[in-house]
């Protein structure tokens, strides 16, 4: 497997900013879910795949994740760790604005933020409307809840990454 990773890294070159491929990962996990049988929890199987994918991806190119989290709220941190694995560097930021700024300013390649709520005073997703702005690349959790502490909530991962359709995608529309 390492030989394949080296070949892919060389083919992408040093200019590859973000090596993750969420559409490929989603398609693969959906295929695994369709043929999954037996008592072994699919969420555990998906977590093992997330760990392997993240570790091999880190060998291709370094990337890091900014997460909205503080000393009292760990849910998004746990969701991000379940998705991106234990080897990907993650940093907690206390506010949505600080977390999203990390991707806008290219300090981190991915930000994990709470799913939009109509009641939000300062909706972060409005900032994603520009042509060069980061975009939502995935919803978390993808394959069930792992080791989440605290109140469960959905989250979105945001990055500067063009996605290819998988055929099972959801579209987010911003109307002001």
Residue ranges and their predicted role:
Residues 1-176:
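Domain-level signature for soluble enzymes in the chorismate/prephenate branch of the shikimate pathway
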């Amino acid at each position: 497997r390492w030989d394949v990773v080296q070949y892919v890294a060389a083919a992408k070159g040093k200019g590859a900013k973000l090596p993750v491929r969420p559409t490929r990962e989603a398609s693969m996990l959906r295929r695994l879910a369709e043929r999954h049988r037996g008592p072994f929890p699919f969420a555990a199987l998906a977590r093992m795949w997330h760990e392997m994918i993240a570790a091999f991806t880190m060998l291709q190119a370094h990337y890091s994740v900014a997460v909205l989290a503080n000393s009292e709220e760990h849910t998004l941190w746990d969701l991000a760790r379940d998705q991106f694995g234990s080897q990907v560097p993650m940093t907690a930021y206390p506010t949505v604005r600080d977390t999203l700024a990390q991707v806008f300013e290219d300090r981190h390649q991915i930000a994990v933020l709470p799913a939009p709520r109509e009641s939000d005073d300062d909706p972060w997703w409005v900032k994603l409307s520009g042509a060069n702005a980061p975009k939502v690349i995935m919803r978390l959790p993808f394959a069930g809840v792992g080791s989440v502490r605290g109140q469960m909530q959905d989250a979105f991962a945001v990055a500067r990454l063009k996605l290819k359709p998988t055929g099972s995608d959801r579209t987010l529309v911003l109307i002001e």
